[in-house]
Regions:
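Conserved catalytic cores of very large enzyme subunits
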Residues: 1-222, 229-231, 240-371
Length: 371
């Protein structure tokens, strides 16, 4: 999903054949939507059928199936402090993935049935093979190829988090599982939203020719302001300029480290720096990239077990559009040193600022996700 976009026949054509397309149809693929390849005039792909936050599922696995508010969202599994091996980690993660993918499928299939009953799309069906021959609309499975494609993100963050545990707890043994868990539970000694904005001073002005920027006029913020409060101030300014009476507020409550001593904060921050300095996905390091691959394949293999009401297969995708930013707010601190509520990695790209060996190394890491 980068700029410029790159599409590779040597990867796409075999992938489509693996999905049941004939070789001729696979060779005739085109890119629709954002980046999705499909055979034109023969496919009802329903791409972007859902967004699936892999990092949130791993977050839930860390807490034994519970959300940050203590509510049991998934199956009861061993929480992170009870993981005695990588097998324990993967058992908890895979169990939660299985559960939440099943809920994704239930929701998508319900929508699919609603599409069939409420929006049969007869005109579009007349243009898609073989709806007329089968006597079915595309919503009933009239197309030759039928898919449902949910999109995942947070798989790179999850892979990096898994590698940090593997390296520091089970290999180097310089940190314990409990140490990492306690530091995460206190957001590494920082208040919620820390790490999102740490510049000394920012002034948004009308120098830009963009209309939205001009409408902002100027909003001054200090280094003590969180990103949420900065965004809130800017949006409120724009709304006021446009005469809108719409109000907007962003919850900027601090939920972390309210009971930390200075010594605890320093210790949690020390742990975060160790985790953050750990080798990361995107630098063509096999042992790191294989953790991201495993995290991704657990999700994708589970998705591909299911069929949709049109008789087609579920197929997993991995890109977020921009949901990695918004949905990062639902994910607590992770074992890779990421602060609570911070944005997640952009699709299968490395985490922001953690690819240090150039674009070819990043490309090599991405290529390992599905070998």
């Amino acid at each position: 999903t980068g700029v410029p976009a790159m599409y590779n026949d040597e990867a796409i054509i075999p992938a489509l054949c693996n999905r049941g397309l004939t070789l001729a149809d696979a060779r005739n693929y085109c890119i629709i939507g954002c980046v999705e390849p499909q055979c034109p005039h023969k496919t009802d792909g329903w791409h972007d059928a859902a967004f699936f936050n892999v990092a949130k599922v791993f977050d839930i696995a860390i807490h034994g199936g519970k959300n940050r508010d203590g509510k049991q969202l998934g199956p009861v599994t061993k929480p992170m402090p009870e993981w005695k091996s990588m097998d324990d980690l993967y058992e908890a993660y895979e169990t939660q993935i299985q559960y939440f993918v099943s809920k994704l499928v239930e929701a998508d299939n319900a929508v699919d049935i609603a599409h069939r009953e409420r929006a049969p799309l007869p005109f579009m069906s007349a243009l898609v093979d073989d709806c007329i021959g089968r006597g079915k609309t595309v919503m009933e499975g009239g197309a030759i190829y039928n898919f449902t494609g949910p999109q995942a993100f947070g798989n790179v963050d999850t892979g990096d988090a898994i590698y940090c545990i593997k390296k520091h707890v089970f290999e180097d043994k310089d940190l314990t599982m409990q140490q990492i868990y306690d530091a995460m539970e206190h957001n590494f000694g920082a208040e919620l939203g820390a790490g999102c904005y740490d510049g000394p001073f920012v002034r948004l002005s009308t120098d830009s020719a963009e209309p939205a920027a001009a409408a902002m006029e100027s909003v001054s913020v200090s280094s003590e302001d969180s990103m949420e409060s900065i965004i809130n101030a800017v949006v409120q300014k724009i709304l006021a300029e446009k005469g809108s009476n719409l109000s907007m507020s962003v919850d900027t409550k601090s939920e972390a480290c309210t009971s930390c001593s200075d010594a605890q904060r320093a210790e949690y921050d020390r742990i975060r720096h160790i985790l953050d300095a750990t080798p990361c996905f995107g630098n063509d390091i096999d042992e790191v990239d294989m953790c991201a691959r495993k995290a991704t394949q657990v999700y994708s293999h589970e998705v591909e077990k299911y069929k949709n009401p049109r008789g087609g297969q579920y197929q997993a995708g991995c890109y977020p559009v921009s949901a990695n930013v918004l949905f990062g707010k639902d994910v607590q601190a992770l074992p890779d040193g990421r602060y609570s509520n911070a944005p997640l990695a952009d699709g299968v790209s490395p985490r922001q600022g953690h690819d240090v060996k150039g674009p070819t190394a990043a490309g090599n890491s991405v290529a390992k996700l599905d070998q």
